[in-house]
């Protein structure tokens, strides 16, 4: 089996980007170690702090954020970073070539119940000139690399550098990420959907109708039965979609009119959308392709519908839009 470093060489990924990816991977090994130790190391539970989203931070949110910041500062290739746990962008190295956006511990509410969590990251080119928030406001099409690390029964890294999606598994003895799936592919059709049904009454009418039709199964207009899955961590739900197909959605809702969207564009939706498109799936807000959105702020939120291409098209048809064309992977 190829190691991650060997794989990057075989794909002719340039040296500096390879170095950055390896730094992210090495840091994820340390995060995996911290997650595994959990209560034994006294790192479970919440703090009294809130992040910029107004969400109470878990102890491991802060610990993993600091681990990634420290590693990226030492790497030398990073111009700046943006994190779910940082109010503002952080300048790293004046000579860095890349910007890194990340969610250090996606699904951290699952930590205290020993369920799935992960790290999501996105790598963008660093524009010339002074580093400001505007430097980061690039569409998802500009991503040079994206991926996530899933901390589950095995620690797994899903990665794209624009050449498909590869899956690596952390070997528990050698502590190396080894290539275990050279070409992840999302089946175009599915009978699985992932959504937080407790918000049903707050969704827009198109999504309410779409889900209602799925629940009708064979006797409904879709003429087939669907199963629902929900992990409550985007990283886990998207991993399932990449592994065996499905549709994942966190749609617009009016539960809190000031926050109609849940997921963040720059370090959740964009990297996951790139992975999904590179694996043959589609990713949309319901009204536009996620990777084509021009961001307006670092912590911008969007609706997310992604997964098996034909099922995403079916969902979008309820929104009155035909997205039947193949996604652009330039």
UniProtKB/Swiss-Prot annotation:
GO molecular function: fructose 1,6-bisphosphate 1-phosphatase activity; magnesium ion binding
EC number: 3.1.3.11
Keywords assigned: Carbohydrate metabolism, Cytoplasm, Hydrolase, Magnesium, Metal-binding
Co-factor requirement: Mg(2+)
A GO term from the CC aspect: cytosol
Pfam annotation, one family: FBPase_C
Membership in a protein family: Belongs to the FBPase class 1 family.
Name the UniProt record assigns to this protein: Fructose-1,6-bisphosphatase class 1
Organism: Shewanella sp. (strain MR-7)
